[in-house]
């Protein structure tokens, strides 16, 4: 996998994209700001290439890899949207008991990058299940802007209940060893923190990548060990860390936090120029080691 960072793009452009992608800046303002860079000599084509995802770059494990098998499963979500759907990836020729990892997408639905993350976990010997929050609206639409708009239009409380239902569903997998981990990115990082806090028996280990914490009143419930990945340039999420860390310490939650130098929010996502190959691979090796330690 070739590193996708565009070091010649001003950091401000990545910051603006982060605000736009998380609903803190409207599209008109975002494009106007990019237009200011065009006036300085940057081409809009180059900026678009640098900021928008190219999912052809994100496939590290093919869907037809002989070491895995993938399928889609639906599950009941009575407190959520009624029914959920997820991408289940298992090691091929599955026998015996295996740990399970819930894989939680960003704020735009189950895109190809997150599906590939699930395949990477199965390739490493885990059973992986990646639900799609957009299933009630027909599923991930094929592009991130529309996916973000769809997810933003949905009831957040019901989405949270759908992920609780997904965790409860996949824990009943016949080949489960009884341990469930969760890894999530951006919104998914928040969901990992939320699942750890809303029911301290739901997950056994959590890995939030650049995710905000659960609301303060729930944090006292957290028991699962956490491996927290943060990016140096992610001012929005990093601003929430000092208080969250203080609460984790106060409630004696076992945790480790890694701050990845010169990395942006989304540095693990190899479909965008925010991808940092070195930091992404380091964080992933730490993630696999953590799950092997906590779930096996």
Regions found by a protein language model. Name each.
Residues 1-29:
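N-terminal secretory signal peptides
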Residues 18, 29-53:
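N-terminal export signals
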Residues 57-94:
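N-terminal cap/lid segment of alpha/beta-hydrolase-fold proteins
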Residues 97-106:
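Short beta-strand element of the alpha/beta-hydrolase
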Residues 134-157, 266-271:
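Cap/lid segment of the alpha/beta-hydrolase catalytic domain
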Residues 149-172:
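Alpha/beta-hydrolase active-site loop
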Residues 165-223:
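Primarily recognizes the serine-hydrolase "nucleophile elbow" in alpha/beta-hydrolase
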Residues 228-230:
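Short beta-strand/loop motif that positions the catalytic acidic residue
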């Amino acid at each position: 996998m070739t590193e996708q960072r565009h070091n010649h793009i001003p950091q401000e452009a990545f910051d603006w994209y982060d605000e736009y992608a998380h609903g803190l800046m409207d599209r008109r303002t975002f494009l106007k700001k990019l237009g200011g860079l065009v006036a300085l000599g940057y081409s809009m084509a180059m900026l678009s290439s640098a900021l928008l995802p190219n999912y052809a770059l994100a496939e590290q494990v093919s869907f037809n890899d002989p070491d895995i098998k993938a399928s889609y499963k639906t599950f009941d979500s009575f407190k959520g949207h009624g029914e959920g759907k997820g991408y289940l990836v298992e090691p091929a020729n599955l026998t015996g008991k295996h740990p399970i990892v819930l894989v939680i997408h960003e704020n735009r639905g189950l895109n190809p990058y997150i599906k590939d993350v699930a395949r990477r976990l199965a390739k490493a010997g885990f059973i992986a299940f990646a639900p799609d929050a957009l299933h009630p609206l027909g599923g991930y639409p094929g592009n991130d802007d529309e996916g973000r708009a769809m997810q933003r239009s949905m009831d957040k409380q019901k989405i949270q209940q759908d992920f609780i239902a997904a965790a409860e569903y996949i824990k009943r997998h016949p080949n489960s060893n009884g341990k469930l981990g969760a890894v999530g990115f951006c919104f998914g990082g928040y969901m990992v923190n939320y699942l750890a806090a809303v029911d301290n028996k739901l997950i056994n280990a959590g890995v939030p990548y650049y995710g905000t914490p659960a609301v303060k009143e729930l944090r006292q419930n957290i028991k699962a060990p956490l491996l927290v990945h943060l990016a140096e340039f992610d001012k929005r999420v990093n601003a929430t860390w000092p208080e969250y860390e203080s609460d984790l310490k106060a409630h004696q939650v076992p945790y480790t936090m890694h701050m990845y130098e010169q990395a942006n929010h989304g540095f693990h996502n190899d479909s965008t120029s925010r991808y940092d190959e070195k930091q992404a691979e380091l964080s992933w090796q730490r993630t696999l080691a953590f799950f092997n330690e906590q779930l096996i």
